[in-house]
Amino acid sequence: MLTLARQQQRQNIRWLLCLSVLMLLALLLSLCAGEQWISPGDWFSPRGELFVWQIRLPRTLAVLLVGAALAISGAVMQALFENPLAEPGLLGVSNGAGVGLIAAVLLGQGQLPNWALGLCAIAGALIITLILLRFARRHLSTSRLLLAGVALGIICSALMTWAIYFSTSVDLRQLMYWMMGGFGGVDWRQSWLMLALIPVLLWICCQSRPMNMLALGEISARQLGLPLWFWRNVLVAATGWMVGVSVALAGAIGFIGLVIPHILRLCGLTDHRVLLPGCALAGASALLLADVVARLALAAAELPIGVVTATLGAPVFIWLLLKAGR
């Protein structure tokens, strides 16, 4: 038994090391790649100072943090709701952030600064989170809370559809680009949003013990002495914050929160002491690579990153599911 535990521990360490190396390589590629390839030796030249430090670095950091936040949010939701299909958009938090951002665009007639749009997106996500917490205080079961989140997401989606239908052509273009996700407008002015993600990310990565209990199911978690009501509220609030900030930075990005935790579990990373940091590393790597593809796929334009993540990730996910089912 001790030998098996040591083997599993070594395997987990190898996985984390491999994911760390992958993230560093993806980070390096993201800083080098673009309309002009700039190797690390040229980063401190006048050209590198402009393209790398002023344009690519803030975008790369935003992609890294959003990828980590979405993947960790997916892992938390899948444990909290005991559902492998749970992901950040399932509770309606992503759509709530979208409603806040769309309201800001329409009411501000496209004149509001980026920081105001970001605050409105976070406010929309937190409003949906507060509604979910109110449901949770009624001691609803996890399945009922999940259904409540789905219903809120449908309502928010309907509101966004109505807003797009009645918007002007200029607003419509901005809204449609946001709904497909993208980091094209990110620069150092959004650094406050990036900083808002870091404390919550680090805190959740340290909560492996309650997450492991939650993954066993509600009944087992209660028997082990976990204050289920408290942890459900705290984790829903933390997830709402991360998703709201991510939407404010990059818009709606699917796939990452659903597939990354699932892929790591299929690879044997089931302990949340390893799964949570693994999700952060893998989510950041996947979104960095998708962002590079989005930038380089077309010569004269940039692809929406949400389209890239779905196109590249879905076949890999299906292959892993088929492989695991044999």
UniProtKB/Swiss-Prot annotation:
Q: What is its main location?
A: membrane
Q: Which GO terms describe its biological process?
A: cobalamin transport
List residues traversing the bilayer.
15-35, 61-81, 88-108, 112-132, 146-166, 184-204, 240-260, 274-294, 302-322
* Name of a matching Pfam family: FecCD
- Its topology with respect to the membrane? Multi-pass membrane protein
Where does it reside? Cell inner membrane
Q: Which UniProt keywords apply?
A: Cell inner membrane, Cell membrane, Membrane, Transmembrane, Transmembrane helix, Transport
Keyword Cell inner membrane belongs to the record: yes
One GO term describing the cellular component: plasma membrane
Q: Name one GO molecular function term.
A: vitamin transmembrane transporter activity
Is Transport among the key words of this record? Answer: yes
Complex and partners: The complex is composed of two ATP-binding proteins (BtuD), two transmembrane proteins (BtuC) and a solute-binding protein (BtuF).
- Protein task: Part of the ABC transporter complex BtuCDF involved in vitamin B12 import. Involved in the translocation of the substrate across the membrane.
The record's comment on protein family reads:
Belongs to the binding-protein-dependent transport system permease family. FecCD subfamily.
According to UniProt, the name of this protein is Vitamin B12 import system permease protein BtuC
